[in-house]
Amino acid sequence: MSALKNSLDPVQMLCLDGDGIGPEITAATRRVLQAVDDCFDLNLTFTTQDIGFVSLAASGTTFPDKVLDAAKAADGIVMGPVSTIDYPPASEGGVNPSGFLRKKLDLYANIRPAKSYEGLPPRVGNKVDLVIARENTEGFYSDRSMFFGRAEFMP
């Protein structure tokens, strides 16, 4: 991803809808980001590229090269969930978008907040307010959809 420029330049956000509920999640995220932009004049601009099953049907791969080019040019990426467990083998176009982006853009942290909100009772146990930081400085995450390859597997 590109480095942020001066505050007057547009901030290029790339939206990757993903599979299943991904389009719904990225649309909601985009609305939130637009509301933040309206309040703080961040000058966000949004573009969308297809990944996942939509891309597989259109181009023969779940992550086309043009998406990587767009990701490298973007200042930020919003990516919805993907159904990697259901993808065909890589030899048939089933590339794991999140793993591919992580490797190609040298990303090493996955931040996952979890918080209980008033009016929504917790399903199990007590309320929570935590952030899980999953780092990847040793070179790989275990990938549940990979059964062979570069030491990234879960039997």
List the model feature ranges, each with a label:
Residues 26-37:
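Short, polar/charged alpha-helical segment
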Residues 21, 25:
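Conserved phosphate/anionic-ligand binding catalytic regions in large, soluble enzymes, centered on
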Residues 2-20, 38, 44-45, 53-155:
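Anion-binding alpha/beta catalytic cores of soluble intermediary-metabolism enzymes, centered on
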Residues 49:
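The conserved SAM/SAH-binding core of class I Rossmann-like methyltransferase domains
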